[in-house]
Structures are given as structure tokens and as C-alpha cells.
Swiss-Prot record:
Keywords: Amino-acid biosynthesis, Aminotransferase, Arginine biosynthesis, Cytoplasm, Pyridoxal phosphate, Transferase. Pyridoxal 5'-phosphate binds at residues 106-107, 132, 217-220, 276. It is found in: Cytoplasm. This is Acetylornithine aminotransferase. NCBIfam families: argD (TIGR00707), PRK01278.1 (NF002325), PRK03244.1 (NF002874). Belongs to the class-III pyridoxal-phosphate-dependent aminotransferase family. ArgD subfamily. May also have succinyldiaminopimelate aminotransferase activity, thus carrying out the corresponding step in lysine biosynthesis. GO terms for biological process: L-arginine biosynthetic process. The modification N6-(pyridoxal phosphate)lysine is found at residue 247. InterPro entries: AcOrn/SuccOrn_fam, Aminotrans_3, Aminotrans_3_PPA_site, Class-III_PLP-dep_AT, PyrdxlP-dep_Trfase, PyrdxlP-dep_Trfase_major, PyrdxlP-dep_Trfase_small. It holds the Pfam family Aminotran_3. GO terms for cellular component: cytoplasm.
């Protein structure tokens, strides 16, 4: 089976909502992937921040194998031990009493938050421009990207979108009728946009003053991605009412969670919400393996260390196509001086490195949390040539700006 053959089969059977993906991949191990033609790649996409421990990590493989061999699925008509254990472990890392609702994705986790908001009895919600919370209808109503919303109007809910990172705009939008405010601590899909210092603390104060719930969408930033268990923990004085999780939580398996605290934890009651596969024992066993491996192997420290190396290494290149690097931990955006992210993405792939272009001028890095020094060195060593190739593709004159 070749790349061409697998691509043709994909095109003949799957809907076109993604377009044709750029590369057929057949195997992964650690930070490396192989395509159907046998070419090897360094993975800095990580399944879009999903593969927290890389590919085929022994702890995840063992946990999944053991669980599927004993109890694969029973539905939420019955109790299984893995979701209970995972909920307990999550709450330990939050350091707070709360309740957990398990689902299968970030969009579903945010749908759960949407329903919790509705159950307050208040009709209004506030989200941010550029924010991304999923593509199901409730989550899409919260998403602040009109291009994704327009084909599906009208959307549910009374949602006001305000500029991201602007506490004054947020304060003006939140009223006594506001059920919730939902914010990403870092906007990943919008290009790894980091808010100004104090923004989350201001959001907490604004919501507390009006009785609105503060929902933090940590689907992309959570589970160690930024060097903290959850990114809000890097911000003093911020205790959210609801946190939504997915992506890295399952270590490659579909797993999401809506975690609620205080009064928000008691709003969902029997009949209000549910999912057949939520809390699946196999997915939850994988999630428990992910959390325990992060803790046991000290991966939060590794994330911080490799983040500094990557950020410093990229900026030290002094390449005219690089403006700066933003983000936190191993969620980094290389901001370009020109809108050539797509060209950089392709040049990197040609060089055997997979990166992502979420915005025309941003290259996003989301590698595994156990990223090794050798992979970082290989990336930094290849990057100048990748940037040169991208500029040459766009301009035909070698390095951008010369």
C-alpha cells in the first residue's frame, strides 16, 4: 500500500468535510511517524495536542490492553471502576472538590458546559472573538469564528462575543442575566494567542461580581500541555467554576471531560444530559495512564525545559521570516513576518517534520510532553533550511526579506 493508493481509497469513501488530508500515516512510535511509503517524520503536531505521551507509549498500550481484555464497555446504566478512578485523579490535580462528566471530545465537553449554563436559569452567555470551542451546535454558538458559524445559522443561545484579552469589553458584556463566560486561557486554533497578564483574574472578578459562571476551555491547554496540570493554575487568584478537557486527556483515545465545582457541580441531574460512550472504561484507563505517567516521569518539568529550549532556539536563529515565538509550555506559535505558514508547513513536511499552520502567519507546535533533547535538536537544526525553502517557494529569491 502506497501513499497514493491510500489517498485514493480515502477520497472514494470518506466525506469531504476535511478536504483531502495531506499525508497518509500508517505507524507511530514516540515522537516519530511513518507514511505509507515508509518515510519517517518528527511529529510536532501530536494529533492536534492529543498525543501527550507520543505514539504507542507502553503505559497507554498496557492500560488499554488490560482494560479491553477485562471490561470494554457497559454504558452509564452501570458503574465501572476506570471512570471513577480517573475522576478521582483529576480532582486531585485540581486540588478541589468537584464533579466530573465524561464524554468523548472537546466539543462534547463544551456542550456539557453550555447545558450547565442553561440550568442556572439565565439566558445569556459571553464568549470571545477568535475563540474555538467545537463544531456541534451549542459549542459552535460559543465559537467566535464567523466563517465556521455562517453555514449553520441560526445557532442556539443568546451569545455575545467580545474581544479576547480585553477586560473592559468583558465587563461591559456581562450582566445579571449572564449564565456563563467561556474563555480559553490561550487561543490555540486562533494562532496560539496569549492574553495579557491579569486577564483571567479580571474575568474571575467580573463573573463573581455578577453571579455568572466562569468556564475555562482547557481542551488544548490542559493536562500538562503548558507545564502546569491546567493552564489556569499559572495565574494567581483564578478558580473557575467549570473546566472543559479533552485532547491530551485520553493519550490518543477519544476522551473529554466537563469538570465543575461549587454550585455548578450540582446542576446536571438525571435526564438532563448523557452520552452512550462517555466514561468508557478503555478510554478512562488510557486517561489514568496518561495522568500517572506525567506525574511519575516529571513531565511538567520536561515541558517547561523543552519549551525554553525551543523558544530560545527559534528566536536565536535571527531568521528574517521569524517575528517571535508565543505560547506556553509545548503549545507554541512561531509568528512569522509574512503570511507564509502554509509554505512553512509544506517545507517542513518535505524535510520530514510535521507542524501545523492554524493562521496565515503562525506555525503551531504541539509535540508530546515527553519530547526528548534529540528531537528538539533535530527540529532546530532543520528549521533554517525549512524557513529558507518556504520563502523561496513564495518569492523565488531564497531567504525572506533579503
Amino acid at each position: 500500500m502506497s501513499n497514493e493508493e491510500l489517498t485514493e481509497r480515502w477520497q472514494g469513501t470518506l466525506m469531504n468535510n476535511y478536504g483531502t488530508p495531506r499525508l497518509p500515516l500508517v505507524r507511530g512510535e514516540g515522537a516519530r511517524l511513518w507514511d505509507a511509503d515508509g518515510k519517517e517524520y518528527l511529529d510536532f503536531v501530536g494529533g492536534i495536542a492529543v498525543n501527550a505521551l507520543g505514539h504507542a507509549h507502553p503505559a497507554v498500550v498496557d492500560a488499554v490492553s488490560r482494560q479491553i481484555a477485562s471490561l470494554g464497555h457497559v454504558s452509564n446504566l452501570f458503574i465501572a471502576e476506570p471512570p471513577v478512578a480517573l475522576a478521582e485523579r483529576l480532582l486531585q490535580h485540581f486540588g478541589r472538590d468537584g464533579k466530573v462528566y465524561f464524554c468523548n471530545s472537546g466539543a462534547e465537553a463544551n456542550e456539557g458546559a453550555f447545558k450547565i449554563g442553561r440550568l442556572t436559569g439565565r439566558p445569556h452567555m459571553v464568549a470571545t472573538r477568535g475563540g474555538f470551542h467545537g463544531r456541534t451546535m451549542g459549542a459552535l454558538a460559543l465559537t467566535g469564528q464567523p466563517g465556521k458559524q455562517e453555514p449553520f445559522l441560526p445557532l442556539p443561545g443568546d451569545v455575545t462575543h467580545v474581544p479576547y484579552g480585553d477586560p473592559q469589553a468583558l465587563a461591559a458584556a456581562v450582566t445579571e442575566e449572564t449564565a456563563l463566560v467561556i474563555i480559553e486561557p490561550i487561543q490555540g486554533e486562533n494562532g496560539v494567542v496569549v492574553p495579557p497578564p491579569g486577564y483571567l483574574k479580571a474575568a474571575r472578578a467580573i463573573t463573581a461580581a455578577t453571579g455568572a459562571l466562569l468556564v475555562l476551555d482547557e481542551v488544548q491547554t490542559g493536562v500538562g500541555r503548558t507545564g502546569h496540570w491546567f493552564e489556569y493554575q499559572a495565574h494567581e487568584g483564578v478558580l473557575p467554576d467549570v473546566v472543559t478537557l479533552a485532547k491530551g486527556l485520553g493519550g490518543g483515545l477519544p476522551l473529554g471531560a466537563t469538570v465543575a465545582f461549587g454550585r455548578a457541580a450540582d446542576l446536571l441531574q438525571p435526564g438532563h444530559h448523557g452520552t452512550t460512550f462517555g466514561g468508557n472504561p478503555v478510554a478512562c484507563a488510557a486517561g489514568l495512564a496518561v495522568l500517572d505517567t506525567i506525574a511519575d516521569e516529571g513531565l511538567l518539568d520536561n515541558v517547561k525545559r523543552q519549551s525554553e529550549t525551543l523558544r530560545g532556539g527559534v528566536e536565536a536563529l535571527g531568521h528574517p521570516l521569524v517575528a517571535h515565538v508565543r505560547g506556553a509550555g509545548l503549545l507554541l506559535g512561531i509568528v512569522l513576518t509574512e503570511p507564509l505558514a502554509a509554505q512553512v508547513q509544506q517545507a517542513a513536511q518535505d524535510a520530514g517534520i510535521l507542524v501545523n499552520a492554524p493562521a496565515p502567519d503562525v506555525v503551531r507546535l504541539m509535540p508530546a510532553l515527553n519530547l526528548g533533547d534529540d528531537v528538539v535538536e533535530a527540529f532546530l537544526g532543520a528549521l533554517p533550511g525549512i524557513l529558507d525553502q518556504a520563502a523561496e517557494t513564495a518569492h523565488g529569491d531564497g531567504r525572506s526579506g533579503e
